[in-house]
Every structure is written in structure tokens, then in C-alpha cells.
């Protein structure tokens, strides 16, 4: 049995977890998260300097807590893992330096994990999970991507957003409506009492230079502009702003676009298994529409467990265990952090000569 201490500090969630792998089954032994949402809400978004300071304060206590809850000690750990990319550089450094220090001190391997690989691995924390190949819709505050996972667990990006990620669009539209941060939960809450068909907002497409559109790509900046113009139009007519209807219509069109392009991609690629992960995967309307579409098309669907949709260290531990079980992967102690790094190049995080 392998046991990993995993850390996540890529943005505004400080997290630590202890995860084990026995006979191919991943078990969560302890999982702790310290959220900074309330503090960043005062600023309408994440303030990088505040985020990194809070990670410094929170992480030692979270590590202490997971060991106390699991009744394990550091001598029981086989490796330490931390998110090293992508994310806020200052925040990533806190987790990375902590993990490398512990690994060096106790002479155990260190694994630098790609944050998106962590999200992809969140499905292995559920009782039932698919076997590759499958298509993943990864949708969060910073990313909206369609990723094919092949039988060797190699990644191929087939679709992406060319501007705002879906979660970012939720935050921006929430701000236009005067709602709190983060925008996803705020919009979902008031959308429940709105009419999702009241306003017909556009489905953004990305044009090819030679004509036509990229079939699996996304664009949400035009949708945000359409919502802004609708709000301005209503206000210019001195009418009461139907916030619930606007929120519901916006939420519906985002979910519809994500569902339509995901299933088109899966069917075109001959994949009969689809996976939904990431922070926006917690959206109830999106989950319901994904399940309904999967039933229509006889495609197997796996939704990330609700508690592991947003950033957490358990998914980072799951990703690290998969790396350890597939080959004897470990990262160089010289591996740093990077605000951006393509998922397709995540294998390079385990090279003797680190990429950054």
C-alpha cells in the first residue's frame, strides 16, 4: 500500500490530504480545506498577494490536522505531492516548497502535479470510475477544455476556450448583476426562480481562418457582452431588472453549449464514455443536462463527486498515486512552479532535468 501526503495551493484554497492506494483502489484517509472565499469576496475576486499569505498561515495547520485525523505519522508516508502548475505563482510556491522540504527532510519522493491532471483524477475518488479511453470536459474558473484520455493515460486536448473560461464568465456576469463572488454559486441560487428561456443569449463560436468554425472550441466573451447589453437596454427603458430571468437564461445557455460540444466531440471521436470535472461541474443544471444527454445518446457519463469539483488536495493525491502506480515517477527536487504549462506536457514534470 502506498500513502501520499498531497498539498494544493494553486489559487485561493489551501488544502492538504492523505490518500492511499491498495490493490488499485484509491482511498481518502483525511482531507482538509481552508477556504479564502469570504476574504477575496470583499475585493470581487482573488487577490494573489493575500492568497499566498493565507497559504503560508494555513498549510502547517492543515497538514497537522490530516495526520491527527488519520492517526498516521510522517514516517508512514511514501511520498509528498503538490500542485506546481498552472496557477498563481506565489501561491504555488508555498505548496511546492513545503512539499519539497518535507520530502527532502524525510528522504521520500516528491511529485509535482499538474493542477488539471488533479481535476481529471478526481473521478478516481468515487466508487465507480471509467477506464480509458474517455473524453473529459474540464470546466472551471480558469479552464474550459475537452481532453481525450487514451488507454495509456496520455492526454490530447481536442477543444478549449479562446477567451473567458466558463467559470470566469459566471464571475463576470454575476458582477454585472450585482451578485457576490464567486459568481457560479450566486447565479445558480437565483437562477432557480428564473425563466431559462426568457432571454435568448448567443452561443459563441470560434471562427477558423479559412472559414467555418472550430467544432469543439468555446468562446464566452461575446455571451458576457450580450448579457451586459441586455441589462443596459432594460435599464434605459426604466424597467425593473429581472435578475432571476437573466441569471437563469445565462446559466442555461452556458450549460447547453458545454453539453452540445462535449457530446459532438465524443461522438465524432468514437468515444462512448464522457467525464465531467472541475469547479463548474458542481453546477446542478449542467449536471442534469449532461445526464439527460448521455441517456439520449447511450453514452456512459461520470460526474466528479460534488465535494471534489472545486480545488482540493485529495484529487492531487489521486493524481500522484496514479503516477506512482503506472511507473516509478518522481519529480526533481529542483522542479519549480509555473503559472502556465500545457497538460499534454505534464510528463516532463518527472524528468531528471525539470522544465522550470
Curated annotation (Swiss-Prot):
Fe cation binds at residues 115, 119, 311. Its EC number is 2.3.1.234. PROSITE patterns: GLYCOPROTEASE (PS01016). Keywords: Acyltransferase, Cytoplasm, Iron, Metal-binding, Transferase, tRNA processing. Pfam families: TsaD. It comes from the Bacteria. It catalyses: L-threonylcarbamoyladenylate + adenosine(37) in tRNA = N(6)-L-threonylcarbamoyladenosine(37) in tRNA + AMP + H(+). One of its GO terms (molecular function) is iron ion binding. GO terms for biological process: tRNA threonylcarbamoyladenosine modification. Binds 1 Fe(2+) ion per subunit. InterPro entries: ATPase_NBD (IPR043129), Gcp-like_dom (IPR000905), KAE1/TsaD (IPR017861), Peptidase_M22_CS (IPR017860), TsaD (IPR022450). Its cofactor is Fe(2+). One of its GO terms (cellular component) is cytoplasm. Substrate binds at residues 138-142, 171, 184, 283. It is an enzyme of class 2 (transferase). It is found in: Cytoplasm. Belongs to the KAE1 / TsaD family. HAMAP family: TsaD. Required for the formation of a threonylcarbamoyl group on adenosine at position 37 (t(6)A37) in tRNAs that read codons beginning with adenine. Is involved in the transfer of the threonylcarbamoyl moiety of threonylcarbamoyl-AMP (TC-AMP) to the N6 group of A37, together with TsaE and TsaB. TsaD likely plays a direct catalytic role in this reaction. This is tRNA N6-adenosine threonylcarbamoyltransferase. It comes from Prochlorococcus marinus (strain NATL2A). The lineage of its organism: Bacteria, Bacillati, Cyanobacteriota, Cyanophyceae, Synechococcales.
